[in-house]
């Protein structure tokens, strides 16, 4: 009996040890997941307690490996936008990859925020002034904490933002791989009309009138007056379109950034963008970027009503006097932007 009793006692001790080990492991697992779900809180420079991304999760982790097991509708939407760009690049490889290798000069539109590991490709006439303001605040390059305190002209001073072309090749490759890259796009012809209205119908834009207006009038207007040739301040939209579709124009020099195509400014067939925001959902998409960057607790995208904004109805009116032939040629110039960013052919177009 004694050997049997000793054996039972020994087995009981083993069972208790195994149970204690399992319980301890279970408690450790609970603590681990609690720490994952409740990252350390730090105080941001604006005096508000928010979750600080540094030392925890990067924007790329937040985007592609969210803590929530189920993807949000927003994440699914942006995945669809990424897929649209990829599919368009693949289907139009000959057209979209005319250049196989990018040079540092091709990266001058990509603004870098080191602190939050963000890269933003700015596209003129797609809320780029406000996004440059935000990038100035995020990167700490300036004296401002409120984006709307930054004068518009100061947001466009190149020294106030660091762009990707300022880095060495290894540094460029590292940031393209590790940082969250995003851009904002707009219906191509609405953006084009917005650029025309801003640069050619406003009297204060004398530099554009001199640089481009005089050239457009000289090339496209018969019997132009000497005053028009000298000032270049009364360019008609029809003349602007004729200038854009003229093969000589792009052979002479690249388009100005305000009417250059997005795929030529940001190179989405060479650079994988993690987020494609749209002007039509500007506030929602912008605040999603800020949330992924871990700053939505104290920074929001600036919103204000702009009565001079170019609308779809306005764009329709501008295209009424453009011939079907010129509309077709202009669509070919911006075709990749329409396809990549899933904009349908406008109803007002009369394509040949």
From Swiss-Prot:
GO terms, molecular function: chondroitin 4-sulfotransferase activity; dermatan 4-sulfotransferase activity; N-acetylgalactosamine 4-sulfate 6-O-sulfotransferase activity; sulfotransferase activity
Glycosylation sites: 205, 223, 321, 342
Predominant subcellular localization, coarse grouping: Golgi
Lumenal side: 38-352
Keyword Transmembrane found: yes
Segments on the Cytoplasmic face: 1-16
Residues at which 3'-phosphoadenylyl sulfate binds: 124-130, 186-194
Subcellular location field: Golgi apparatus membrane
GO biological process, one term: polysaccharide localization
Post-translational modification: N-glycosylated; required for activity and stability.
Function, as annotated: Catalyzes the transfer of sulfate to position 4 of the N-acetylgalactosamine (GalNAc) residue of chondroitin. Chondroitin sulfate constitutes the predominant proteoglycan present in cartilage and is distributed on the surfaces of many cells and extracellular matrices. Can also sulfate Gal residues in desulfated dermatan sulfate. Preferentially sulfates in GlcA->GalNAc unit than in IdoA->GalNAc unit. Does not form 4, 6-di-O-sulfated GalNAc when chondroitin sulfate C is used as an acceptor.
Identification of the protein by name: Carbohydrate sulfotransferase 11
Record gene name: Chst11
């Amino acid at each position: 009996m004694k050997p049997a009793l000793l054996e039972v006692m020994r087995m009981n001790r083993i069972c208790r040890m195994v149970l204690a080990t399992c319980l301890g492991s279970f408690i450790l697992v609970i603590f681990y997941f609690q720490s994952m779900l409740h990252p350390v809180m730090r105080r941001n420079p604006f005096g508000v307690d928010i979750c600080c991304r540094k030392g925890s999760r990067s924007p790329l982790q937040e985007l592609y490996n969210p803590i929530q097991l189920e993807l949000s509708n927003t994440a699914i939407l942006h995945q669809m936008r990424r897929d649209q760009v990829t599919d368009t690049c693949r289907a139009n490889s000959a057209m979209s990859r005319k250049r196989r290798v990018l040079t540092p000069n091709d990266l001058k539109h990509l603004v870098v925020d080191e602190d939050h590991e963000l890269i933003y490709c700015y596209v003129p006439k797609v809320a780029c002034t406000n996004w440059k303001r935000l990038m100035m605040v995020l990167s700490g390059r300036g004296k401002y904490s409120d984006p709307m305190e930054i004068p518009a002209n100061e947001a466009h001073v190149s020294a106030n933002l660091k762009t990707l072309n300022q880095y060495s090749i290894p540094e460029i490759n590292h940031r393209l791989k590790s940082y969250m890259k995003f851009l904002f796009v707009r219906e191509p012809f609405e953006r084009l009309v917005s650029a025309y209205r801003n640069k050619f119908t406003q009297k204060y834009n004398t530099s554009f009138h001199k640089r481009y207006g005089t050239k457009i009038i000289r090339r496209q207007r018969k019997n132009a007056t000497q005053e028009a040739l000298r000032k270049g301040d009364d360019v008609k939209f029809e003349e602007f379109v004729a200038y854009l579709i003229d093969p000589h124009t792009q052979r002479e020099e690249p388009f100005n950034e305000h009417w250059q195509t997005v795929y030529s400014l940001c190179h989405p067939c060479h650079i994988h963008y993690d987020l494609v925001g749209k002007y039509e959902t500007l506030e929602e998409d912008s605040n999603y970027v800020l949330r992924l960057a871990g700053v939505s607790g104290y920074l929001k995208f600036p919103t204000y009503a702009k009565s001079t904004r170019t609308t779809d109805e306005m764009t329709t009116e501008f295209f009424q006097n453009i011939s079907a032939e010129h509309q077709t040629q202009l669509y070919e110039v911006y075709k990749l932007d329409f396809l990549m960013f899933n904009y349908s052919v406008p109803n007002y177009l009369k394509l040949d």
